[in-house]
């Protein structure tokens, strides 16, 4: 069967950016920036994106493009006879399934809140009533399961229509709409009374605040966010590399994806901080920011129903773009592993992913258990821990070693592939850092994640 190709360079960049852009850009980055010294945190974050995220992304793209295979078979196409690098391909697929086991549920939350806000069901509620609306959603397996199934059915339907006619076409529209909505929301926030104070807190470097949090904590936080924001390590980027031609060098393409991801993260802060300072609300992170703090603000804002609806539509698009990208990876891997066509792989995964996502849905209600407290309190937190603390850092380390070690694909092969085409090039003077320095940083992120979870 002939390998499918993306129709355009824009499609490749928007698909890859859609995979990287997710809810963490909104519910984690602005909070970390605010607490970590504003502009000081942002500067360190940008530095770590360049020295940490960019090289590994280019390696995933290179492995995909050189092999023209999904992550499960890419290593086999490139490794030397008798080597075992391909084992990671199976772990990458498991990591993608694990990620979707909870991400489909969270995407469902965004869809539910878009409906609730657009229908006016959150308008005029008190702060306590807004908080209880979120609690009631978590306590209802029916509501959570319904929206999770909507997300899975929509995403599988898009992927089943094919690479160009389904995934690329829908993602282009979704990503352009996402970016447009963000700009509209940010402009609205900039005209709020507390905008100047909020932007000062967010963007002006404040090293005194950075010292209060701890310089080391801030640096590690910036490093972790720069690493995890790009969804590296489970082959979700490699699959899109396998769908493109050799016209453009891959480091330059990686820069474009990272710039889009960073634009969304920084613009999210432009939306959130002016609103929080205008309405005197403490800026929080995670689900409490998205489902309690911001709905409270929208409930008290002029035209709050409109702005709230736009915000949750943006969040739904951000979540769905990631779901679509990872579903494509899963479907393509299963097509190659099981020798299925796209439609059969899509149908099988429709039922499989719904079944695998149910524990996350039920973990907040029928299957709630105190034993999950060490991970954060629910099945979702355990699944998130496995993906974020194990599969992403260790998977990134495997890609890194495979591309730089003489026992893997090797530096010369990687450099030849990544530099093929027009654009920014990888040079030999980078070899020492990428071969010896970067693996140490990734190992540190892995070790610190375990320490922070179990020992801190």
Which residue stretches match the model-derived regions?
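Membrane-water interface regions at transmembrane-helix termini and the short interhelical loops
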Residues: 32-36, 84-100, 135-137, 150-174, ...
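Inter-helical loop and helix-membrane interface segments of multi-pass membrane transporters/permeases
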Residues: 3-4, 32-36, 66-91, 104-164, ...
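Loop-to-transmembrane helix boundary motifs in multi-pass membrane proteins
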Residues: 5, 11-13, 19, 145-146, ...
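C-terminal membrane-solvent junction of multi-pass transporters and transport-like membrane proteins
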Residues: 88-91, 338-350, 382-442
